[in-house]
Amino acid sequence: MGIQPSPVLLASLGVGLFTLFGLALGTYLVRRSRRPQVTLQDPDEKYLLRLLDKTTVSHNTRRFRFALPTAHHILGLPVGKHVYLSARIDGSQVIRPYTPVTSDEDQGYVDLVIKVYLKGVHPKFSEGGKMSQYLDSLKIGDVVEFRGPSGLLSYAGKGNFNIQPNKKSPPELRVAKKLGMIAGGTGITPMLQLIRAILKVPEDPTQCFLLFANQTEKDIILREDLEELQAQYPIRFKLWFTLDYPPEDWTYSKGFVTADMIQEHLPAPAEDVLLLLCGPPPMVQLACHPNLDKLGYSQKMRFTY
């Protein structure tokens, strides 16, 4: 006859197993509760976010901070994507795309840096920017409709870009060791989003090269952020500026983006090179693309936001 375990031993084992199960379940629930919740659950839904703060960045640029549903929420925006803001303005529905300057490491809020185009300032746009003026008029506590994630490009890390040729096409993988960027004005925000995402990962070998065009020195938004990143990562990130109307002591380039600027400050055409463009249409269409054609950059090597 074999040895039978005593009822006391069986009871002890049962209590021990139950305790272990309870500890495991408790640990799981705690970790789950600490995991941040995502705000942008559905790209077709609109999410009402409340204005928390509005600060002046420069003479015509503001930083708008919006509250997420709770202090433990993140926006949930993949790197490379943007959001749409929509509002009823003067009887019409106005929708504009924006790339936040915060990331999913920031919980409880999202920041947008936006240039405000006022009425009567630019002769070609006498009415100014409808959405930017609307946002500038908001009071703390007002709400705005957000929708996203949106966009044809997303960054998967270590030089891997998923790019859709159009909205209906599946994404195609593009691998780049060198990332060249040409930005104009507020077109810097998607570039900064990518640069930060790449540089914060020591194992990401992607090199970043940025050519940033503006009209005047005071128009350069997020300059301190960019120069701080350049100083911190001098090998991985190269930064260059050009101004239409530079001051006398300006040490960077002058004028529109040229072929010489591209040759000198961006990576040469190659299979492992990707160029990203974001800025005013005249700059992109009249200054950038013709010069990229001239220098031998294929369409596959470019992406325009």
Swiss-Prot record:
GO molecular function, one term: cytochrome-b5 reductase activity, acting on NAD(P)H
E.C. designation(s): 1.6.2.2
PROSITE patterns: FAD_FR
Keywords (A to Z) from UniProt: FAD, Flavoprotein, Lipid biosynthesis, Lipid metabolism, Membrane, NAD, Oxidoreductase, Steroid biosynthesis, Steroid metabolism, Sterol biosynthesis, Sterol metabolism, Transmembrane, Transmembrane helix
Record's bilayer topology term: Single-pass membrane protein
Keyword Transmembrane belongs to the record: yes
Compartments in which it is found: Membrane
Reactions mediated catalytically: 2 Fe(III)-[cytochrome b5] + NADH = 2 Fe(II)-[cytochrome b5] + NAD(+) + H(+)
Obligatory cofactor(s): FAD
Binding site for FAD: 136-166, 175-210
TM stretches of this protein: 8-28
CDD domains xrefs: cyt_b5_reduct_like
PANTHER family assigned to the protein according to its UniProt record, in alphabetical order: NADH-CYTOCHROME B5 REDUCTASE (PTHR19370), NADH-CYTOCHROME B5 REDUCTASE 1 (PTHR19370:SF74)
Protein name: NADH-cytochrome b5 reductase 1
Organism of origin: Rattus norvegicus
